[in-house]
């Protein structure tokens, strides 16, 4: 054939002309799997591979943690951390998480939270951040700090808004928070009595930090401070003013309890809605857990004593985004966006989270929040 007519790519591979290997007759060779004895990693190893040696030490730490020997596990993890290469990111994350969990079990919560905060700052994808947030949740739960526990759950939900189990945990946390805040208000009222030594009547609201879930002023507005005159003509007036403020405080305690119950109820309803949407996709034990949880929620909802139209409105608000988005969340995508952009996906405060999810409900059912400050100014 003329070389000028030869088509590029028209040549044959040499393998076309090669003979195929003959098949061996008889049964195939048996597969011999490597069997490891229990606790095989405790045996002496003469491996020159540093990574393998550190991996064996990690297995020892994991077993000690499993046995609840947290001090021993912490020692193993710490010895690995000192020798681990700075480029071995995967094992470094695992080891640091192990250290944090051991420290939490040993009562060293602040050290555990420092490690968790460091891991959060270095997270580069949603999987890493999710793991760190669950770690923080475990530490705060061990610390029995309700507000921090709730904030951890809020951050998890902002990252995975269609996870029903985190919404359920948030609802339970709100249920526990309500009585705690109400009791704190009552206790503060008893401890901080009104005094006239500085000729002012001081507020007995508890101190509210920047990240408090329900913020109360440390003192009443300037206009609400009542001057206490020494003469008896103003005594009756001052007593009446004190009584009015105490009544307002009692109403405030009741409002705090109702607000937290409303948030708990809304979170339970959101949980139930998400479970109902995922129910057709589930079978076996997953479906059993789903149905059992829905029944438990139904039983707890009876204790709220909210009217049916109230529950319907809450369900409407908490389910606004579900029909369009739930299908996209069945197989969530792992987003690798870098630590800075990843931070933007997570809520920065409880106020921001609650404003997003509960503002419509609160405005409809809790008008007392704005009314309270108005009443105080009128009394002044």
From Swiss-Prot:
Species classification: Eukaryota, Metazoa, Chordata, Craniata, Vertebrata
Protein name: Uncharacterized protein C8orf76
InterPro entries to which the protein is assigned, alphabetical: DUF5588, TPR-like_helical_dom_sf
Superkingdom of the source species: Eukaryota
Gene coding for it: C8orf76
């Amino acid at each position: 054939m003329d070389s000028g007519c030869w088509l590029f790519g028209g040549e044959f591979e040499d393998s076309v002309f090669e003979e195929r290997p003959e098949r061996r007759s008889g049964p195939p060779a048996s597969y011999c799997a490597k069997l490891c004895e229990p606790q095989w990693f405790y045996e002496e190893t003469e491996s020159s591979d540093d990574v393998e040696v550190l991996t064996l030490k990690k297995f020892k730490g994991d077993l000690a943690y499993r046995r609840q020997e947290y001090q021993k596990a912490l020692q193993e993890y710490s010895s690995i951390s000192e020798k681990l290469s700075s480029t071995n990111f995967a094992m470094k994350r695992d080891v640091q998480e192990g250290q944090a969990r051991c420290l939490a079990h040993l009562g060293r919560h602040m050290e555990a939270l420092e490690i968790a905060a460091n891991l959060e700052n270095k997270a580069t994808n949603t999987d890493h951040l999710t793991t760190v947030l669950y770690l923080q949740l475990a530490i705060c739960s061990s610390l029995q700090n309700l507000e921090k526990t709730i904030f951890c759950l809020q951050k998890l939900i902002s990252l995975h808004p269609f996870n029903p189990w985190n919404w359920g945990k948030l609802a339970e946390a709100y249920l526990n928070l309500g009585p705690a805040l109400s009791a704190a208000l009552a206790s503060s009222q008893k401890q901080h009595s009104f005094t006239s030594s500085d000729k002012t009547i001081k507020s007995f609201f508890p101190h509210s930090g920047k990240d408090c879930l329900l913020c109360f002023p440390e003192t009443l507005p300037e206009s609400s401070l009542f001057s206490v005159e020494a003469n008896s003509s103003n005594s009756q007036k001052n007593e009446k003013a004190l009584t009015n403020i105490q009544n307002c405080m009692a109403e405030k305690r009741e409002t705090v309890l109702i607000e937290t119950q409303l948030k708990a109820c809304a979170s339970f309803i959101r949980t139930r809605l998400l479970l109902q949407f995922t129910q057709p996709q589930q079978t076996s034990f997953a479906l059993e857990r789903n149905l059992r949880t829905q029944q438990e929620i139904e039983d707890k909802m009876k204790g709220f004593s909210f009217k049916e139209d109230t529950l319907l409105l809450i369900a409407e608000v908490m389910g606004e985004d579900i029909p369009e988005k739930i299908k996209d969340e069945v197989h969530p995508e792992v987003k690798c966006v870098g630590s800075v952009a990843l931070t933007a996906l997570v809520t920065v405060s409880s106020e921001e989270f609650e404003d997003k999810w509960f503002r419509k409900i609160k405005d409809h059912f809790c008008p007392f929040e704005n009314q309270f400050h108005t009443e105080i100014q009128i009394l002044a």
